[in-house]
From Swiss-Prot:
Changing residue 212 to V: In strain: Md199. Belongs to the Teflon family. GO terms for molecular function: zinc ion binding. This is Protein teflon. Changing residue 381 to F: In strain: Md106, Md199 and NewC. The gene is tef. Coiled coil: none annotated. Changing residue 163 to V: In strain: Md106, Md199 and NewC. Gene3D superfamilies: Classic Zinc Finger. Its main location: nucleus. It is found in: Nucleus; Chromosome. The lineage of its organism: Eukaryota, Metazoa, Ecdysozoa, Arthropoda, Hexapoda. Drosophilid specific gene duplication generates rgr and tef. Teflon has a function unique to Drosophilids.
């Protein structure tokens, strides 16, 4: 290279001048050209040369402008030309090889005719042949042009979709062979059909497998008979008739039987003895037929029997022709006792008015009940000969009352109806002692119920007690927050009537009026669902912040945004319940009516505002799910995001806050 430069510099035609240097940056892997005249850097050689021609031509003394091009520009021009030539050649080849062949034959024929015309004299026969050849050539050209037009029209009308459902078109000329493009289209169609058939078969196989799996997973029908693996024991099979309808459960009036009516058992036993020819039935397991004695039959037969006799039911009594549905009580022995004439004072129905009066009187002195239990705790534990009360869980309750030793009488009473259905209950008392005991027992019982706000005397689990305490603590906390606004009656109407003095009531009313006047200004909060387009959560949070600031300033309290959101949710839920579900307008107290007048501007539809974030919910289910998400263990202090597990929290710290 140095020799070549020396040769150029030695000649008079070429003059070399140093205009710049090559600069290399190793960090960026870049090469640049440094201009000595203006001290600029250029990354490309064509730019550097154009810069020299335009700005430094006076120093370098260019004799003529040199056209400086990059290698890429030169190559791109050559590639475009080559591409255009290839396209033109492709079009010419696709127009049809047959036409070129015919043209070549025509040209040969014409050349031959010309040569013949030049060399030899013209004959009439040759002239006629040449005219026929020319006519044939023109006809073939016309036919080829029409065929080309038809092919173009067919290509334009062909659908672009990949479906090959139509019938294949037959070629007009059987001798004409298929072109390359037609062969390609046929191969594509054939391969696509094969692939689609494979996919179709695969789908059908999957459907068949799913149907077989569903048939295998179906449960057994109830009519299907299972194989019996154990031997059948005929003694254990009950002889009940399943076609007969079930008998209704006897009412209380049918089961309350006097002891004098049991004399009818004598007649029943004699009837069983007379029936010796009756067909025998197999014995039932734990089922003994018993006779149902109504109260009317007991009153008819009570006067005729006065002798104490004891009858034992024999095994023949169980041989009955008709199958009956047995009750859980088994009668093994019947004792016929003397008729009892009880005074009217001992059997009295309990009125609801007396119970309500007793409830009111029992609440006057609650401390007396505790003193009675502390002074003599064994006072309420009487002997079993005087009184015995047994209760069992479930709808059937058996009450056995045994009187004193002077006139021993056994009373068995079956109660089938539940405590909710029975309106009038019968109370059986033997003498004055048991009467006084029952009154004391009921009074202490009612006092305990009133003190604990319970309905049934049941043993409660410690978990239930803790839940009740937590609910009470939550209601107390909400009441304290509502007192700051003057609306404790929303949680409980009895708070203002019982717990507050008249002076405190006046102050509460004044504070409630102030809060309603302030709350009425913020239309976008209490009428969120009717605003269209709906307001954004950021805008609502700003409004709630302004509401809390104004309430704290005017009412001289220290409430947070979460407290204000909780108050708004409680007011909206209370207002919705009054007008829709739980409370009737006719039975509302004066305090509730007063608060309704204050919040008469509120609509029935409302929205739930989350205490811990700016989210707003219309449905209650979504709101409760969202509250559960806040009750988690890990929370980011920077972006206030919540995480259920420690791993998610640590991953968030690594990615979001490195």
């Amino acid at each position: 290279m140095s020799k070549f430069l020396d040769m150029l510099s030695g000649s008079q035609c070429v003059s070399l001048e140093k205009c710049g240097d090559v600069v290399v940056s190793t960090n960026d892997c870049m090469i640049a050209l440094y201009c000595h005249f203006c001290r600029d850097l250029f990354t490309q050689l064509p730019e550097f040369l154009r810069h020299l021609q335009s700005n430094h031509s006076d120093v370098l003394h260019f004799t003529k402008e040199h056209n400086v091009y990059s290698v890429e520009e030169l190559l791109s021009g050559e590639q475009d030309k080559a591409h255009e030539d290839a396209q033109s050649a492709g079009h010419n080849s696709s127009s049809g090889d047959s036409r070129s062949l015919m043209n070549s034959e025509d040209s040969r024929a014409i050349d031959g005719s010309e040569e013949n015309s030049d060399n030899s004299p013209v004959k009439p026969e040759q002239i006629g042949k040449q005219n026929e050849i020319n006519l044939l050539a023109e006809v073939t050209n016309i036919l080829l042009q029409t065929n080309d037009k038809e092919e173009r029209i067919n290509d334009e009308l062909k659908p672009e979709s990949g479906e090959f459902k139509g019938a294949r078109k037959k070629a007009n000329n059987e001798s004409s062979s298929l072109k390359i493009c037609d062969l390609k289209s046929h191969t594509i169609a054939r391969t696509s059909r094969k692939r689609m058939s494979l996919v179709k078969n695969h789908i059908l196989r999957v459907f068949d497998r799913d149907l077989i799996a569903k048939l295998e997973m179906k449960p057994l029908e109830p009519d299907s008979k299972l194989p019996i693996t154990e031997p059948i024991q005929e003694d254990n099979i009950p002889g009940t008739c399943f076609q007969t309808p079930p008998k209704p459960i006897p009412s209380l009036s049918q089961l309350s039987v006097r002891k004098s009516s049991l004399t009818e058992a004598n007649h029943i036993c004699t009837k069983y003895d007379t029936k010796k020819t009756a067909p025998t039935m197999p014995k039932l397991l734990n089922n003994v037929p018993k006779s149902i004695l109504t109260s009317q039959q007991a009153q008819v037969n009570s006067d005729s029997s006065e002798i104490n006799e004891t009858y034992h039911i024999s095994e023949a009594a169980s041989q009955v022709t008709k199958t009956t549905k047995s009750f859980p009580v088994q009668i093994n022995q019947i004792e016929i006792l003397q008729p009892l004439k009880l005074p009217k004072t001992l059997i009295t129905p309990i009125n609801e008015e007396g119970v309500s009066d007793q409830m009111e009187n029992s609440t006057k002195n609650i401390n007396n009940a505790q003193s009675l239990l502390k002074e003599n705790p064994k006072k309420f534990l009487k002997k079993p000969s005087e009184l015995e009360i047994k209760t069992k869980g479930g709808p059937n309750k058996f009450l056995n009352v045994i009187k004193s030793k002077a006139d021993p009488i056994i009373v068995k009473r079956v109660q089938t109806t539940s405590a909710k259905d029975s309106t009038n209950k019968i109370q059986i008392r033997s003498n004055d002692k048991t009467k006084g005991f029952a009154s004391e027992f009921n009074s202490t019982k009612i006092r305990k119920l009133k003190m604990e706000n319970c309905v049934d005397l049941k043993t409660e689990d410690p978990c239930d007690n803790t839940n009740m305490r937590l609910n009470k603590m939550a209601t107390i906390g909400s009441c304290e927050i509502l007192k700051a606004v003057g609306l404790p009656a929303i949680t409980d109407n009895a708070i203002e009537a019982i717990m507050l003095l008249p002076d405190e009531l006046e102050t509460m009313r004044i504070r409630a009026d102030q809060f309603t006047k302030i709350y009425k200004k913020y239309y976008s909060i209490w009428n969120y669902r009717k605003i269209f387009p709906p307001a954004k959560p950021d805008f609502i949070s700003q409004k709630i912040f302004a509401l809390t600031r104004e309430v704290n300033k005017t009412m001289l309290c220290n409430l947070a945004n979460s407290d204000i959101k909780g108050i708004i949710n409680q007011i909206s839920v209370w207002h919705y319940n009054i007008y829709t579900q739980y409370i009737e307008l006719d039975n509302i107290s004066e305090i509730a009516r007063y608060t309704l007048k204050l919040f008469s501007f509120l609509p029935v539809s409302f929205a739930y505002f989350c205490k811990w974030c700016d989210d707003i919910f219309i449905l209650k289910k979504e709101y409760l799910k969202h509250l559960i998400s806040h009750q988690v263990r890990f929370q980011c202090t920077k972006c206030i995001k919540v995480f259920k597990y420690k791993g998610y929290y640590e991953k968030h710290l690594r990615n979001a806050h490195p």
